[in-house]
Amino acid sequence: MAGTGSFHPVHEIEDFLERKPEALQDIVFELRNLVAEIAPCATEAIRRGGLSYYDAERGGTVKGGICQIEVHADHVRLAFNHGAFIDDPRGLLVGERLYKRYVRLESYESAPWEALAELVCTAAGYDPASAGTTGSP
Protein backbone atom coordinates (compact mmCIF):
# COMPACT_ATOMS: atom_id res chain seq x y z
CA MET A 1 0.00 0.00 0.00
CA ALA A 2 2.24 2.74 -1.22
CA GLY A 3 -0.44 5.19 -2.35
CA THR A 4 -2.22 7.88 -0.42
CA GLY A 5 -5.37 6.87 1.40
CA SER A 6 -8.64 8.70 1.47
CA PHE A 7 -10.72 8.97 4.63
CA HIS A 8 -13.94 10.94 4.95
CA PRO A 9 -14.04 13.99 7.23
CA VAL A 10 -15.20 13.09 10.75
CA HIS A 11 -18.41 15.12 10.38
CA GLU A 12 -19.51 12.86 7.49
CA ILE A 13 -19.03 9.78 9.66
CA GLU A 14 -20.90 11.47 12.51
CA ASP A 15 -23.76 12.26 10.13
CA PHE A 16 -23.80 8.66 8.92
CA LEU A 17 -23.96 7.36 12.50
CA GLU A 18 -26.28 9.99 14.00
CA ARG A 19 -29.21 7.59 14.53
CA LYS A 20 -27.11 4.76 15.91
CA PRO A 21 -26.69 4.18 19.66
CA GLU A 22 -23.77 6.09 21.16
CA ALA A 23 -22.22 2.87 22.46
CA LEU A 24 -22.03 1.52 18.89
CA GLN A 25 -20.68 4.83 17.59
CA ASP A 26 -17.80 4.54 20.07
CA ILE A 27 -16.93 1.11 18.70
CA VAL A 28 -17.10 2.36 15.10
CA PHE A 29 -14.82 5.33 15.78
CA GLU A 30 -12.28 3.18 17.60
CA LEU A 31 -12.25 0.64 14.74
CA ARG A 32 -11.92 3.47 12.24
CA ASN A 33 -8.95 4.87 14.17
CA LEU A 34 -7.42 1.39 14.23
CA VAL A 35 -7.71 1.05 10.45
CA ALA A 36 -6.31 4.56 9.91
CA GLU A 37 -3.31 3.75 12.10
CA ILE A 38 -2.59 0.34 10.58
CA ALA A 39 -3.51 1.08 6.95
CA PRO A 40 -3.22 4.86 6.44
CA CYS A 41 -3.14 4.34 2.67
CA ALA A 42 -6.58 2.70 2.70
CA THR A 43 -9.55 4.25 0.96
CA GLU A 44 -12.69 4.62 3.08
CA ALA A 45 -16.15 4.26 1.54
CA ILE A 46 -19.44 4.96 3.29
CA ARG A 47 -21.92 2.24 2.43
CA ARG A 48 -25.54 1.74 3.45
CA GLY A 49 -24.68 -0.69 6.24
CA GLY A 50 -21.36 0.72 7.35
CA LEU A 51 -17.86 1.69 6.32
CA SER A 52 -15.63 -0.16 3.89
CA TYR A 53 -11.84 0.04 3.67
CA TYR A 54 -9.81 -1.09 0.70
CA ASP A 55 -6.47 -0.77 -1.07
CA ALA A 56 -7.35 1.12 -4.25
CA GLU A 57 -4.08 0.04 -5.86
CA ARG A 58 -5.24 -3.60 -5.70
CA GLY A 59 -8.86 -2.96 -6.66
CA GLY A 60 -12.20 -1.93 -5.20
CA THR A 61 -14.00 -2.87 -2.03
CA VAL A 62 -13.88 -6.61 -2.79
CA LYS A 63 -10.62 -7.32 -4.62
CA GLY A 64 -8.73 -4.64 -2.68
CA GLY A 65 -10.79 -5.12 0.47
CA ILE A 66 -9.19 -4.76 3.87
CA CYS A 67 -12.25 -4.76 6.12
CA GLN A 68 -15.73 -3.42 6.71
CA ILE A 69 -17.30 -1.93 9.79
CA GLU A 70 -20.93 -3.04 9.66
CA VAL A 71 -23.35 -1.30 12.02
CA HIS A 72 -26.32 -3.39 13.15
CA ALA A 73 -29.14 -2.52 15.56
CA ASP A 74 -27.43 -3.95 18.65
CA HIS A 75 -23.84 -4.65 17.64
CA VAL A 76 -21.01 -3.82 15.25
CA ARG A 77 -19.25 -6.32 13.02
CA LEU A 78 -15.67 -6.00 11.89
CA ALA A 79 -15.86 -8.02 8.68
CA PHE A 80 -13.27 -9.29 6.22
CA ASN A 81 -14.21 -10.26 2.64
CA HIS A 82 -11.24 -12.64 2.54
CA GLY A 83 -11.54 -13.70 6.17
CA ALA A 84 -11.38 -17.41 5.37
CA PHE A 85 -7.84 -16.87 4.10
CA ILE A 86 -6.32 -14.64 6.76
CA ASP A 87 -4.52 -15.89 9.85
CA ASP A 88 -6.77 -15.87 12.92
CA PRO A 89 -4.68 -17.34 15.75
CA ARG A 90 -7.25 -16.42 18.42
CA GLY A 91 -10.19 -17.95 16.53
CA LEU A 92 -12.29 -14.78 16.59
CA LEU A 93 -13.63 -14.91 13.04
CA VAL A 94 -17.03 -16.47 12.42
CA GLY A 95 -19.38 -16.65 9.46
CA GLU A 96 -21.10 -19.03 7.09
CA ARG A 97 -20.32 -17.33 3.79
CA LEU A 98 -17.81 -18.83 1.42
CA TYR A 99 -14.95 -16.43 2.23
CA LYS A 100 -16.30 -13.57 4.35
CA ARG A 101 -15.77 -13.72 8.11
CA TYR A 102 -16.46 -11.27 10.92
CA VAL A 103 -16.05 -10.50 14.61
CA ARG A 104 -19.22 -9.45 16.45
CA LEU A 105 -18.67 -6.58 18.89
CA GLU A 106 -21.39 -5.80 21.40
CA SER A 107 -19.56 -3.38 23.70
CA TYR A 108 -16.46 -1.23 23.65
CA GLU A 109 -15.24 -2.69 26.93
CA SER A 110 -15.44 -6.31 25.82
CA ALA A 111 -13.80 -5.79 22.41
CA PRO A 112 -10.43 -7.58 22.02
CA TRP A 113 -8.70 -4.48 20.61
CA GLU A 114 -5.21 -5.96 20.28
CA ALA A 115 -6.52 -9.02 18.44
CA LEU A 116 -8.66 -6.83 16.17
CA ALA A 117 -5.59 -4.77 15.31
CA GLU A 118 -3.75 -7.97 14.40
CA LEU A 119 -6.61 -9.04 12.11
CA VAL A 120 -6.72 -5.65 10.37
CA CYS A 121 -2.94 -5.74 9.92
CA THR A 122 -3.10 -9.24 8.42
CA ALA A 123 -6.00 -8.29 6.15
CA ALA A 124 -4.22 -5.13 4.99
CA GLY A 125 -1.30 -7.27 3.84
CA TYR A 126 -3.42 -9.94 2.16
CA ASP A 127 -3.53 -9.84 -1.64
CA PRO A 128 -6.04 -12.30 -3.12
CA ALA A 129 -4.44 -11.94 -6.56
CA SER A 130 -1.16 -13.40 -5.35
CA ALA A 131 -2.65 -15.79 -2.78
CA GLY A 132 -5.38 -17.26 -4.95
CA THR A 133 -8.90 -17.46 -3.57
CA THR A 134 -10.38 -19.76 -6.18
CA GLY A 135 -10.11 -22.90 -4.07
CA SER A 136 -11.85 -23.73 -0.84
CA PRO A 137 -10.78 -22.03 2.39
Where do the protein language model's features map onto the residues?
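Charge-dense, helix-prone N-terminal extensions
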Residues: 1-137
